[in-house]
Amino acid sequence: MEIIDAKHALADIQENIARFQGTLDLEALTEEIADFENRMTEPGFWDDNTKAQKVIEENNVLKNRRDSFLNLTNQAEEIEVLIDMLAEDPGDVDTATELADSIAQAQKDVEAYNLEQLLTEPYDANNAILEVHPGSGGTESTDWGANLYRMYTRWAQQHGFQVDVLDYHAGDEAGIDSATIKITGHNAFGFLRSEKGVHRFVRISPFDSAGRRHTSFVSVDVMPELDDTIEVEVRDDDIKMDVFRSGGAGGQNVNKVSTGVRLTHEPTGIVVSSTVERTQYGNRDYAMKLLKSKLYQLELEKQEAERAALTGEKMENGWGSQIRSYVLHPYQMVKDHRTNYETNQPQQVLDGDLDPFINAYLQWQLSLKNPN
């Protein structure tokens, strides 16, 4: 890397750091962290375990924000030192390589920090519950459902998030009929709420002996995992419970007893299932948690509708309702119809490279809130 290019890159990194610092009161943040940690050492802190965990989580969020910012400033200082070293010995290949690597990492971390600053909605920091439901399109659609399931799993793993399968139903011939996963990690819901909606797929179907082009649709729903501090009233009389034998994806490790639980909320028609726990009681408890999350989300959507704020609304599976198109034939493209962000590398996207789409969505939402 040429020194002049490195200096330009460093100037850009420092400009971003200065912009971040303008919205960050580091002294106040440090005091808030100290206050949380003092509370954690008080007698009786663990008397209410749920409340204690909430305090710890909030403190971790603040510490993560502080440490991420300080890491950026340290990286900028190290890059400045490397530039000076390379200026003294321009032929030092090792220093040049280290400088290029340090700049690339700092640029990546600046982008990640910037992305986190866009997560301002309630429950953005929460874990995410993500559901995949193939729509019209038959076997082609269920196969695309499996591709989306894999895409989100890959994305989560690349970010160090934990993925738990809550419910999985394999398709008759290929793919999946439906799947529900929990993605555990800081800001998982904030990142993935961009994925809620109908995804459209166009390709030459491997299941069509005539080699014709097919269009399929898959609906994705995303909701935050709510903790017990959120009160949602659910009457026992409104719930119908069914039990079934649960097992792994594709029917592996099927239990000989019915531990899987399916709950139907009759007033709304909402159906949730859980097979993640080992006991029927555990699955009922977790299914109830999912139901409350869905009911809470439903109420939020009603409030948004009343304010005519319908962005992010999940629409009916079918023509014209998609939020994103994945085209593999006659050309290669993935395009988000809300932000107009697109790429001609669909395989990278299907392998989990969703961050550019997530970033574009969050920037788009910010522009809707602040049109000027």
Swiss-Prot record:
PTM description: Methylated by PrmC. Methylation increases the termination efficiency of RF2.
One Pfam family here: RF-1
Domain of life: Bacteria
Chief location category: cytoplasm
InterPro entries: PCRF, Pep_chain_release_fac_I, Pep_chain_release_fac_I_sf, PrfB
Keyword Cytoplasm included in the entry's annotation: yes
Keyword Metal-binding in record: no
Function: Peptide chain release factor 2 directs the termination of translation in response to the peptide chain termination codons UGA and UAA.
HAMAP family named among the record's database cross-references: Rel_fac_2
Family: Belongs to the prokaryotic/mitochondrial release factor family.
UniProt cross-references to NCBIfam families, sorted A to Z: prfB
Protein name in the entry: Peptide chain release factor 2
Natural source organism: Leuconostoc citreum (strain KM20)
Gene name for this UniProt entry: prfB
